[in-house]
Amino acid sequence: MSNVLVIQSSILGSYSQSAKLLDNFAVEWKQKHPTDNIVIRDLAAEPLPVLDGEIIAALGGNGELNERQKAAAELSLNLIEEVKTADYVAIAVPMYNFGIPVQLKTWIDLICRAGVTFSYTENGPQGLLVGKKVLVVTTTGGAHRNTATDLALAHIQAVLSLVGLNDISVAYAETLNMGPEAQERGLAEATKAIQAFIAAH
């Protein structure tokens, strides 16, 4: 039995293409692996606290903590534990104004912790969350792949690499706002990549 962590990050609810793609992934994965444990964390439905001075001090373990800081530090460790125990991680990464959703950025801020999920060495940072396979499902309204504006995918890949998640597959659904035919092609391509990931594992 494997553990699968699914991270939803879209704010669009039932209108979200990335959410639909990732929901379909979870359903198809369960059909192939009925005994696997799937944990779904919806960052829009259950928002995380945004990083601020108090929280970053708590994550650094600086001094006596107030109740809010204690809760944030505990939440951070719980989020990290979800990743640690997962064999597979699937993440929805819709592009908003060339970046990632703030909800996803907040999750990143709570799991990227020096000495916990990565360490600094004389050769640079070394990730500590190794040995996992990741599926990134990214959606864009326009055509950005392999261009300077493909910033959402570049961001999440850099962050995942920082913490040791280097085995990354990408399902890319682009041109979703460029007409019905372009949308259909984009979704079909992403669906094919998702199915290939499932078939390979």
Swiss-Prot record:
Which keywords fit this entry according to its UniProt record? Flavoprotein, FMN, NAD, Oxidoreductase
Q: Name one GO molecular function term.
A: FMN binding
InterPro entries per UniProt? Flavodoxin_fold, Flavoprotein-like_sf, FMN-dep_NADH:Q_OxRdtase_AzoR1, NADH:quinone_OxRdtase_FMN_depd
Record Pfam families: Flavodoxin_2 (PF02525)
Q: Which domain of life is it from?
A: Bacteria
Instruction: Enumerate the catalysed reactions.
Output: 2 a quinone + NADH + H(+) = 2 a 1,4-benzosemiquinone + NAD(+); N,N-dimethyl-1,4-phenylenediamine + anthranilate + 2 NAD(+) = 2-(4-dimethylaminophenyl)diazenylbenzoate + 2 NADH + 2 H(+)
- Top EC category: oxidoreductase
Report the EC code(s) recorded for this entry: 1.6.5.-, 1.7.1.17
Which positions bind FMN?
S10, S16, Q17, S18, M95, Y96, N97, F98, T139, T140, G141, G142
Q: Which cofactor does it need?
A: FMN
Which function does this protein serve? Quinone reductase that provides resistance to thiol-specific stress caused by electrophilic quinones. Also exhibits azoreductase activity. Catalyzes the reductive cleavage of the azo bond in aromatic azo compounds to the corresponding amines.
HAMAP family (UniProt xref) = Azoreductase_type1
Q: Which family does it belong to?
A: Belongs to the azoreductase type 1 family.
Put simply, this protein is called FMN-dependent NADH:quinone oxidoreductase
Natural source organism: Tolumonas auensis (strain DSM 9187 / NBRC 110442 / TA 4)
Lineage, opening ranks: Bacteria, Pseudomonadati, Pseudomonadota, Gammaproteobacteria, Aeromonadales
- Name the gene: azoR
